[in-house]
A protein has these predicted regions:
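Gly/Ala-rich phosphate-binding loop of Rossmann-like dinucleotide-binding domains
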Residues: 31, 35-36
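Glycine-rich Rossmann-fold phosphate-binding loop(s) that bind the pyrophosphate
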Residues: 23-24
Protein backbone atom coordinates (compact mmCIF):
# COMPACT_ATOMS: atom_id res chain seq x y z
CA UNK A 1 0.00 0.00 0.00
CA UNK A 2 2.68 2.42 -1.04
CA UNK A 3 0.24 4.91 -2.55
CA UNK A 4 -3.41 5.60 -3.19
CA UNK A 5 -3.30 4.51 -6.83
CA UNK A 6 -1.99 1.07 -5.86
CA UNK A 7 -4.76 0.69 -3.30
CA UNK A 8 -7.39 1.76 -5.83
CA UNK A 9 -6.08 -0.80 -8.32
CA UNK A 10 -6.03 -3.56 -5.71
CA UNK A 11 -9.63 -2.79 -4.76
CA UNK A 12 -10.79 -2.75 -8.38
CA UNK A 13 -9.03 -6.05 -9.09
CA UNK A 14 -10.12 -7.51 -5.73
CA UNK A 15 -6.50 -8.46 -5.09
CA UNK A 16 -6.26 -6.75 -1.68
CA UNK A 17 -5.76 -9.43 0.99
CA UNK A 18 -7.43 -8.80 4.35
CA UNK A 19 -6.77 -10.28 7.79
CA UNK A 20 -9.10 -9.66 10.72
CA UNK A 21 -7.50 -10.47 14.07
CA UNK A 22 -10.22 -11.33 16.56
CA UNK A 23 -13.36 -12.86 15.05
CA UNK A 24 -15.76 -12.57 17.94
CA UNK A 25 -19.01 -10.64 18.22
CA UNK A 26 -17.79 -7.68 16.13
CA UNK A 27 -14.75 -9.11 14.37
CA UNK A 28 -16.57 -11.92 12.57
CA UNK A 29 -19.25 -9.65 11.05
CA UNK A 30 -16.44 -7.26 10.09
CA UNK A 31 -14.56 -10.04 8.32
CA UNK A 32 -17.73 -11.17 6.56
CA UNK A 33 -18.38 -7.62 5.37
CA UNK A 34 -14.96 -7.44 3.71
CA UNK A 35 -15.41 -10.90 2.20
CA UNK A 36 -18.86 -9.94 0.92
CA UNK A 37 -17.21 -7.01 -0.89
CA UNK A 38 -15.20 -9.58 -2.86
CA UNK A 39 -11.94 -9.28 -0.93
CA UNK A 40 -10.07 -12.40 0.12
CA UNK A 41 -10.41 -12.34 3.90
CA UNK A 42 -8.99 -14.51 6.65
CA UNK A 43 -10.02 -14.34 10.30
CA UNK A 44 -7.59 -15.08 13.10
CA UNK A 45 -8.58 -16.15 16.59
CA UNK A 46 -6.97 -18.00 19.50
CA UNK A 47 -10.21 -19.94 20.04
CA UNK A 48 -9.44 -23.18 18.21
CA UNK A 49 -12.95 -24.55 18.71
CA UNK A 50 -14.46 -21.43 17.13
CA UNK A 51 -12.05 -21.53 14.19
CA UNK A 52 -12.68 -25.21 13.50
CA UNK A 53 -16.44 -24.73 13.67
CA UNK A 54 -16.32 -21.79 11.25
CA UNK A 55 -14.19 -23.72 8.78
CA UNK A 56 -16.70 -26.57 8.94
CA UNK A 57 -19.38 -24.12 7.82
CA UNK A 58 -21.08 -23.44 11.14
CA UNK A 59 -22.07 -19.82 11.77
CA UNK A 60 -21.70 -19.07 15.51
CA UNK A 61 -23.68 -15.83 15.87
CA UNK A 62 -27.23 -17.10 15.53
CA UNK A 63 -28.60 -13.96 17.22
CA UNK A 64 -27.24 -11.63 14.53
CA UNK A 65 -29.95 -11.32 11.84
CA UNK A 66 -28.79 -11.41 8.23
CA UNK A 67 -25.25 -12.60 8.75
CA UNK A 68 -25.73 -16.35 8.42
CA UNK A 69 -26.75 -15.89 4.77
CA UNK A 70 -23.68 -13.72 4.16
CA UNK A 71 -21.50 -16.28 5.94
CA UNK A 72 -22.77 -19.13 3.77
CA UNK A 73 -22.25 -17.15 0.57
CA UNK A 74 -18.69 -15.99 1.26
CA UNK A 75 -17.74 -19.48 2.42
CA UNK A 76 -19.17 -20.93 -0.78
CA UNK A 77 -17.36 -18.31 -2.87
CA UNK A 78 -14.08 -19.08 -1.10
CA UNK A 79 -13.62 -15.50 0.11
CA UNK A 80 -13.49 -16.27 3.83
CA UNK A 81 -11.72 -18.74 6.09
CA UNK A 82 -10.45 -18.79 9.66
CA UNK A 83 -7.22 -19.85 11.34
CA UNK A 84 -5.39 -19.83 14.65
CA UNK A 85 -2.08 -19.33 12.85
CA UNK A 86 -1.49 -15.58 12.95
CA UNK A 87 1.97 -15.87 11.39
CA UNK A 88 0.66 -17.50 8.24
CA UNK A 89 -2.34 -15.18 7.97
CA UNK A 90 -0.37 -11.96 8.38
CA UNK A 91 2.30 -13.09 5.93
CA UNK A 92 -0.37 -13.27 3.20
CA UNK A 93 -2.18 -10.02 4.03
CA UNK A 94 -1.98 -6.38 2.97
CA UNK A 95 -4.58 -5.02 5.37
CA UNK A 96 -4.72 -6.06 9.03
CA UNK A 97 -7.78 -5.17 11.08
CA UNK A 98 -7.52 -5.45 14.86
CA UNK A 99 -10.91 -6.24 16.37
CA UNK A 100 -9.87 -7.27 19.85
CA UNK A 101 -11.61 -6.84 23.21
CA UNK A 102 -10.64 -3.94 25.47
CA UNK A 103 -12.75 -4.74 28.56
CA UNK A 104 -12.85 -2.66 31.72
CA UNK A 105 -11.44 -4.18 34.91
CA UNK A 106 -12.90 -3.87 38.42
CA UNK A 107 -11.38 -0.40 38.73
CA UNK A 108 -12.87 0.69 35.39
CA UNK A 109 -9.45 0.70 33.75
CA UNK A 110 -9.39 -0.66 30.17
CA UNK A 111 -7.44 -3.86 29.61
CA UNK A 112 -5.41 -3.54 26.43
CA UNK A 113 -3.43 -6.76 26.86
CA UNK A 114 -4.96 -8.47 23.80
CA UNK A 115 -4.04 -5.54 21.54
CA UNK A 116 -0.56 -5.28 23.01
CA UNK A 117 0.09 -9.00 22.62
CA UNK A 118 -0.93 -9.01 18.97
CA UNK A 119 1.15 -5.91 18.20
CA UNK A 120 4.19 -7.61 19.73
CA UNK A 121 3.61 -10.54 17.39
CA UNK A 122 3.27 -8.24 14.39
CA UNK A 123 6.76 -6.81 14.89
CA UNK A 124 8.29 -9.94 13.36
CA UNK A 125 5.69 -10.96 10.79
CA UNK A 126 4.16 -7.81 9.30
CA UNK A 127 4.73 -7.55 5.57
CA UNK A 128 6.35 -4.43 4.04
CA UNK A 129 3.90 -1.60 3.30
CA UNK A 130 1.08 -3.22 5.28
CA UNK A 131 -1.76 -1.15 6.70
CA UNK A 132 -3.03 -1.77 10.23
CA UNK A 133 -6.48 -0.50 11.19
CA UNK A 134 -7.48 -0.61 14.86
CA UNK A 135 -11.23 -1.10 15.18
CA UNK A 136 -11.16 -1.73 18.92
CA UNK A 137 -12.22 1.06 21.26
CA UNK A 138 -9.11 2.66 22.75
CA UNK A 139 -8.39 5.84 24.66
CA UNK A 140 -7.01 8.89 22.83
CA UNK A 141 -3.24 8.70 22.55
CA UNK A 142 -2.96 4.97 23.24
CA UNK A 143 -2.19 4.16 19.61
CA UNK A 144 0.43 6.89 19.29
CA UNK A 145 2.07 6.38 22.70
CA UNK A 146 1.76 2.62 23.17
CA UNK A 147 0.86 0.57 20.11
CA UNK A 148 3.26 2.28 17.71
CA UNK A 149 6.02 2.02 20.32
CA UNK A 150 5.40 -1.73 20.56
CA UNK A 151 5.33 -2.16 16.78
CA UNK A 152 8.59 -0.25 16.37
CA UNK A 153 10.16 -1.95 19.38
CA UNK A 154 12.44 -4.35 17.49
CA UNK A 155 13.57 -1.62 15.08
CA UNK A 156 12.26 -3.66 12.11
CA UNK A 157 9.15 -1.56 11.62
CA UNK A 158 8.99 2.20 11.18
CA UNK A 159 5.62 3.88 10.82
CA UNK A 160 5.36 5.91 7.64
CA UNK A 161 8.29 4.06 6.10
CA UNK A 162 7.51 0.33 5.87
CA UNK A 163 4.03 0.22 7.42
CA UNK A 164 1.22 2.58 8.33
CA UNK A 165 -1.62 2.58 10.82
CA UNK A 166 -4.96 4.19 11.53
CA UNK A 167 -8.30 3.71 13.25
CA UNK A 168 -11.90 3.14 12.26
CA UNK A 169 -13.65 2.38 15.56
CA UNK A 170 -16.44 -0.15 15.33
CA UNK A 171 -19.90 1.29 15.84
CA UNK A 172 -22.43 -1.46 16.38
CA UNK A 173 -24.68 -2.96 19.03
CA UNK A 174 -25.00 -6.72 19.62
CA UNK A 175 -28.06 -8.13 17.89
CA UNK A 176 -28.19 -5.18 15.47
CA UNK A 177 -24.76 -5.38 13.86
CA UNK A 178 -25.90 -5.73 10.24
CA UNK A 179 -28.27 -2.80 10.64
CA UNK A 180 -25.61 -0.67 12.33
CA UNK A 181 -22.87 -1.60 9.84
CA UNK A 182 -25.11 -0.46 7.00
CA UNK A 183 -26.61 2.65 8.60
CA UNK A 184 -24.41 4.25 11.26
CA UNK A 185 -21.57 6.63 10.31
CA UNK A 186 -17.97 5.52 10.90
CA UNK A 187 -15.06 7.65 12.10
CA UNK A 188 -11.79 7.42 10.17
CA UNK A 189 -8.39 8.65 11.29
CA UNK A 190 -4.91 7.82 10.05
CA UNK A 191 -1.40 8.46 11.27
CA UNK A 192 -1.07 10.82 8.31
CA UNK A 193 -3.25 12.30 5.59
CA UNK A 194 -2.48 9.63 2.99
CA UNK A 195 -3.29 6.82 5.42
CA UNK A 196 -6.62 8.46 6.22
CA UNK A 197 -7.44 8.65 2.52
CA UNK A 198 -6.49 5.00 1.99
CA UNK A 199 -8.60 3.76 4.91
CA UNK A 200 -11.52 5.86 3.67
CA UNK A 201 -11.21 4.41 0.17
CA UNK A 202 -11.21 0.84 1.49
CA UNK A 203 -14.09 1.28 3.93
CA UNK A 204 -16.12 3.13 1.32
CA UNK A 205 -16.04 -0.04 -0.78
CA UNK A 206 -17.09 -2.30 2.08
CA UNK A 207 -19.55 -0.23 4.11
CA UNK A 208 -22.29 1.85 2.49
CA UNK A 209 -22.34 4.44 5.28
CA UNK A 210 -21.08 7.97 5.85
CA UNK A 211 -17.38 8.02 6.69
CA UNK A 212 -16.52 10.96 8.92
CA UNK A 213 -12.93 12.05 8.39
CA UNK A 214 -11.06 12.97 11.56
CA UNK A 215 -7.81 14.99 11.59
CA UNK A 216 -5.90 12.17 13.30
CA UNK A 217 -6.22 8.91 15.23
CA UNK A 218 -6.35 10.61 18.62
CA UNK A 219 -9.33 12.74 17.62
CA UNK A 220 -11.18 9.77 16.12
CA UNK A 221 -10.77 7.78 19.33
CA UNK A 222 -11.81 10.76 21.47
CA UNK A 223 -14.98 11.26 19.43
CA UNK A 224 -15.76 7.53 19.63
CA UNK A 225 -15.47 7.54 23.43
CA UNK A 226 -17.61 10.67 23.66
CA UNK A 227 -20.25 8.95 21.53
CA UNK A 228 -20.15 5.93 23.85
CA UNK A 229 -20.63 8.15 26.92
CA UNK A 230 -23.55 9.97 25.27
CA UNK A 231 -25.19 6.64 24.41
CA UNK A 232 -24.70 5.27 27.94
CA UNK A 233 -26.18 8.41 29.51
CA UNK A 234 -29.24 8.14 27.26
CA UNK A 235 -29.65 4.48 28.20
CA UNK A 236 -29.38 5.44 31.87
CA UNK A 237 -32.29 7.84 31.53
Amino acid sequence: MANIDEVRNSLESKSLKVCVVGIGRIGLPTALSFAKAGLQTIGVDINEKLVNSINLGNFPLKDEPGYEEIFNKVKKDGNFSATTNINEAISKSDLILLSLPTPMDKKNIPNYSALETVCKQLTDILQPNSLIVVESTIEPGFLENNLISILEGTDKLHVGKNFTIGVCPENANPGEILHDFTNLPRLVGGIDEQTTKIITMIYDLVFSVELVIMPDCKTANAVKLTTNVFRDVNIGF
